[in-house]
Amino acid sequence: MKFSPIRRSLLALVLAPALAAGFVGSALAQTTLLNVSYDPTRELYQAFNPEFAKHWKAQTGEDLVIKQSHGGAGKQARAVIDGLEADVVTLALAYDIDAIAEQTGKIPADWQKRLAHNSAPYTSTIVFLVRKGNPKGIKDWGDLVKPGVEVITPNPKTSGGARWNYLAAWGYALKQPGGNEQTAQAFVTEL
């Protein structure tokens, strides 16, 4: 089949980029992963991802690009359930992973069984930020319910970190003399 010079030029313009992309793609093996995570891990993964990419390259010979999506853990879980194509999910609570497993089937329902004691591989540290000089003398959970003290924390319905805050406050109340479910409920309600 003969093509006019104009058609040949048009075909060259259309096919050249496609062919070049195919050759470049095969020459540069690359994997891209999306890690859907919760807000406090942003800086952790900014430091971790380049080191993991080096390890991946050494193990596989492939370049690795890791993309991040951060937000409240509950909202991130909902996004995955609603179709966000995550390759890795690193959320604050097992509850969020369970919801993804139950509603999408993309994670085995018994995912925790692969770890000792059905563990979730995360910990969390609660930190109290106070005004300069700590004028109200806040040192422990009990200080947070003193008159004049206000607590600012994210919503536990959408934030895994806030759920840890809630659970830590509950645990504190349980460990107080006479602590039980009722006193813990009263404490977190007052808080």
What are these regions (language model features)?
Residues 168-175:
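Helix-loop "lid/cap" segments that line or gate small-molecule binding pockets
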Residues 18, 22-23, 46:
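Local alpha-helix boundary/kink/capping signal
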Residues 176-191:
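Ligand-binding pocket segment of bilobal, Venus flytrap-like solute-binding proteins
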Residues 161-166:
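Active-site cradle of extracellular carbohydrate-active enzymes
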